[in-house]
C-alpha cells in the first residue's frame, strides 16, 4: 500500500476506534500492520489489527485475544472461545469460502492487475493510479464498513470469549 494511503487509513482507524470503542489503545505498530488492545480484565486482553496487503491497496482486519498482555502470534485460525488465546481474520467470521474478504481502496486497479502485468511483460505502459486527492474520500467509508463488521462479528466474538472466561459484564463502549 502506498504510504499516503496507509497513513490516511491508520488515521481513520484511530478516529473510528476512539469514537466507537475508546477502551482500545494502540498496542504496537509494524511496517504493514497496526494493533490496538483492550485489557478487558486482569486476565483477558482483546486485540484488533489492521493489516495492509503488500503491493496492493487493500487491507484486512484481525480480531484476537490472549490471557496475557502479549499478542497471540501463534493462534491464527483458532477461535474456540474457551481457549487461552485466539486469532482470526474478521472476514472469516462471516465468510467460509476460499476467497477471503478484504477491503479494497482501488478496486478498479485490482480488477486490472492481470492486464497490467501482461502489458508490462509486453513493454507497454500501464495506467497511472488516481491522485491521492481522489483516493482519500474512499478511505473513511471503507474503515466505517470494517468497523461495522467488527461491531457485528468481532464484538459478539469478544463477548462470547469473555463469558467463557468468567467475565459476565463486558462494557464495549457502545452499550
Where are these regions (language model features)?
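Intrinsically disordered, low-complexity regulatory regions enriched in serine/threonine/proline
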Residues: 1-14, 27-175
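Conserved acetyl-CoA-binding loop of GNAT-fold acetyltransferases
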Residues: 22-26
Amino acid at each position: 500500500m502506498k504510504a499516503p494511503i496507509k497513513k490516511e487509513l491508520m488515521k481513520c482507524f484511530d478516529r473510528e476506534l476512539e469514537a466507537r470503542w475508546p477502551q482500545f489503545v494502540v498496542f504496537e505498530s509494524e511496517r504493514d500492520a497496526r494493533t490496538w488492545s483492550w485489557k478487558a480484565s486482569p486476565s483477558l486482553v482483546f486485540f484488533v489489527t489492521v493489516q495492509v496487503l503488500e503491493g496492493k491497496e487493500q487491507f484486512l482486519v484481525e480480531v484476537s485475544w490472549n490471557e496475557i498482555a502479549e499478542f497471540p502470534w501463534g493462534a491464527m485460525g483458532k477461535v474456540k472461545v474457551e481457549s487461552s488465546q485466539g486469532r482470526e481474520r474478521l472476514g472469516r467470521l462471516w465468510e467460509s469460502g476460499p476467497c477471503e474478504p478484504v477491503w479494497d481502496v482501488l478496486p478498479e486497479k485490482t480488477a486490472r492487475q492481470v492486464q497490467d502485468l501482461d502489458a508490462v511483460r509486453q513493454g507497454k505502459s500501464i495506467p497511472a493510479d488516481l491522485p491521492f486527492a481522489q483516493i482519500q474520500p474512499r478511505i473513511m467509508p471503507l474503515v466505517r464498513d470494517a468497523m461495522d463488521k467488527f461491531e457485528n462479528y468481532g464484538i459478539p466474538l469478544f463477548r462470547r470469549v469473555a463469558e467463557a472466561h468468567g467475565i459476565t459484564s463486558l462494557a464495549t463502549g457502545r452499550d
